[in-house]
A protein has these predicted regions:
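Gly/Ala-rich phosphate-binding loop of Rossmann-like dinucleotide-binding domains
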Residues: 16, 20
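A short, structure-level motif marking secondary-structure boundaries and short turns
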Residues: 1-2, 21-22, 101-104
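Rossmann-like NAD(P)-binding element
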Residues: 31-34, 41-64, 70-113, 144-148
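Short beta-strand element of Class I
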Residues: 26
Length: 158
């Protein structure tokens, strides 16, 4: 199983490390600094890094042999980015996604905006899940467990 993580702040890196320890392949994209993403990859904090959201979506939805699984297996994308970057990131990400894909938002976004995003994404067949735990260190394990035990088994083949 693999997913894409957008934003590589310390909380994102810790979540990624936890998921990697549990057998999940985590590809990272930094909205700020590709070199920093490469350093995190070299340290083993992420499974790989990409230079754009487009490449992240392609990587998460490929089988490693160059074949895309778009429409067959949902792509799962976690966002852990500052509130001012959310709108631009989603404007770029959503058109790249397909029905059945999942966005998990760990940002500090306003709840009303998140409710609007959930409605908009649901019309496209995309699941938008607002977790709203940005900055809470105890949430790292909880969110990873939610993903690994709830979302992954019901949405992803083993």
């Amino acid at each position: 199983m693999k997913l894409g993580i957008i934003g590589l702040c310390p909380i994102a890196v810790n979540m990624s490390r936890n998921m990697i320890e549990n057998g999940i392949e985590v590809w990272g994209y930094s909205i700020v600094d590709y070199e920093s993403a490469c350093e995190k990859y070299e340290k083993g904090y992420i499974s790989g890094c990409v230079t754009s959201l487009e490449y992240l979506v392609q990587t998460v939805k490929s089988d490693g042999l160059g074949h895309t699984s778009a429409g067959k297996v949902p792509g799962i994308f976690q966002m852990i980015i500052p509130e001012p970057k959310i709108e631009d990131t989603l404007d770029e990400l959503i058109p790249l996604l397909d029905e059945g894909d999942i966005i998990i938002d760990h940002s500090s976004n306003d709840i009303k905006k998140c409710q609007e995003l959930e409605k908009y994404c649901s019309k496209l067949g995309i699941s938008y899940i607002f977790v709203g735990v940005y900055g809470a260190t105890h949430a790292i394990n909880a969110c990873s467990k939610i993903f690994a035990h709830t979302i992954a088994p019901t949405r992803m083949p083993t």
